Amino acid sequence: MVAGASTGGLYAYTDALCRGLCRIGAEVTVLTNQLWVDLPRPFRVERLLFEFTDKKKQWSQLHWAADRFYRSLRNSLRRNQFAVREHFDVVHFQGVGTPLLDQFFLKSLRRHLPVVLTVHDVKPHYERFVSRASFIKRSLQIPHRLIVHYEDGKRQLADHWSVSTDRIDVIPHGIMRLQNPPDLTAARKKLNLPSNCQIILFFGAIRPNKGLDILLKALEIIKSRNQQILLVIAGGLLGRFNFEPYSDIIKKADLSNYVQTFIHFIPEEEVDYFFAASDLVVLPYLKFEAQSGVLLRAYAHKKPVVVSDIGAMGELVSSDKVGLVVEPSAVEPLAEAVINALDSHDKFQSCYGPELENKYSWEHIAKLTMRSYEAAISGEPSPSCA
């Protein structure tokens, strides 16, 4: 398993998947360029690769780019040499690393070992260079098998990157297991939130494609019909974005008594408090082509959700019946969906039963992943992974 992240969603995903694979009898080695937290694990972690650092941006852009290219080149060489020397049955990459180099080094590795690649973001949030997109496209033609997390992602991968659907396996993203999550009362006390109202949660990095402005406009309708409502906005601002446009909406619509903000990066140890404290999680995204970590966290806490019908979100929520789906940018339908979801809270929450738990269990995800490995090794089409 090749994965660079040592924090955040990709790290948690890789760690959980590797544990699941070990539980069904696989022997797993993770190659990483980061120092993973020193926890007892049933798999081997090799910090073999050079770590990237944005501190190099203190230098000239050219110097920084040259350093990054050098580290990527060394990483690709060391990774391939190590994998071939260890005679792994399959090499599984968690995303495309450096497409300029991957188009060559993945091809070289494929001559010796079966290669599987999970495409977490079918269309990257930011495609800065046309040339990078062409490198990604070439890199995606190389692996024996590609894994995406939802059916529409399979279609998008085929259409956007010209990948044959015969090489694509659909394997859901597993749900993280919560360790002693706080209850609603304790979570609200911790965050200093009121105990006598229904709380809607908007969580995660704040940027224009997340549709927070649409939710705030919908809140003006919602509060006219439910005075005991509070929207909690929790997350940091990315790049050049600022909160001022949202503050203006709050002020003009007289929503200050119905909104509480935590506009900063939320440390991992605090995240569960926000979800535990909420009655409903809303994702009113306008554009989003990846799997949503916020939605998966809501699933982990068994919270009803309202989501836009884009990417994997609408597909999952409609199938699992844990909430309501609305068209993006639709203010009044969003307001109605939030009101109805709160009124039907217990019905939606009851859908988080054993069947859903098994569907997203890491043992089940590991078994589906193993099928993809077996297809890569044999060269035969994979059995259905959905």
Walk through the language-model features, giving the residues of each.
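Glycosyltransferase donor-sugar binding loop
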Residues: 36, 175, 230-246, 264
